[in-house]
């Protein structure tokens, strides 16, 4: 609601890398929900380049991402100054799930700090975003880690530069193409 009592128009978007699958499931079960758009938090500024978003919500998804810190940087980047990134996640889900499937990162609160970690790396989110964001972190009633990150300045371009990502994606694509073109590719999973 605006100060003069009028309702402010909202443009709410739902994004997920698996949008096509979720949309099919919702259609199959005749769910009346907004359609989910394809998008990846690690590349959010490619989908929303205008830097005028007020709120980004990431719920139970950072632990699934390929690069949680890049997801945070990109999410802050698309926000207007003063905009907020809200995070809500199960505590240390990768440990709970034994690093199986999508669960490759843990998210927790330690000594009042938001920490993202796995067996190979550990990140203090407030420390890594100190020059362009303010962070508060707590626990919800259901025991999830919740954080609000408010954008205070522009994200340094070096943190959202995607040239290295493009190289890695091209290498991954070429490796998959080599594997797929192997005459043995179809046999690997067919023997049971």
Go through the PLM ranges and name each one:
Residues 54-67:
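A short SAM/SAH-binding and catalytic strip from SAM-dependent methyltransferases
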Residues 1-44:
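Class I SAM-dependent methyltransferase SAM/SAH-binding core
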Residues 125-192:
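Core SAM-dependent methyltransferase catalytic element
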Residues 39-56:
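A short acidic, Gly/Pro-enriched loop at the edge of an enzyme's catalytic core
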Residues 7, 66, 80, 130:
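Short conserved AdoMet
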Residues 84-113:
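Conserved class I S-adenosyl-L-methionine
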Residues 69-84:
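A short glycine-rich, Lys/Arg-flanked "PGG" loop and its adjoining helix->strand segment in the class I
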Residues 105-137:
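Short alpha-helix
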């Amino acid at each position: 609601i605006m100060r003069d009592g009028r309702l402010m128009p909202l443009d709410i978007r739902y994004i997920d890398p698996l949008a096509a699958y979720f949309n099919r499931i919702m259609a199959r079960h005749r769910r009346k929900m907004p359609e989910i758009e394809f998008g990846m938090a690690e590349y959010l500024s490619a989908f929303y380049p205008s830097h005028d978003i007020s709120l980004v919500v990431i719920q139970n998804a950072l632990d699934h991402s390929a690069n949680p810190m890049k997801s945070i940087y990109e999410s802050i980047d698309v926000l207007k100054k003063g905009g907020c990134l809200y995070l809500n996640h199960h505590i240390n889900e990768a440990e709970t799930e034994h690093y199986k499937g999508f669960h490759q990162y843990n998210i927790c609160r330690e000594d009042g700090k938001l920490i993202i970690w796995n067996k190979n790396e550990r990140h203090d989110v407030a420390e890594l975003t100190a020059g362009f964001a303010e962070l508060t972190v707590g626990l919800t009633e259901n025991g999830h880690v919740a954080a609000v990150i408010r954008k205070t300045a522009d994200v340094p371009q070096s943190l959202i530069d995607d040239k290295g990502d493009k190289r890695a994606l091209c290498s991954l694509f070429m490796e998959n193409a080599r594997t797929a073109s192997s005459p043995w590719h179809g046999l690997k999973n067919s023997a049971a």
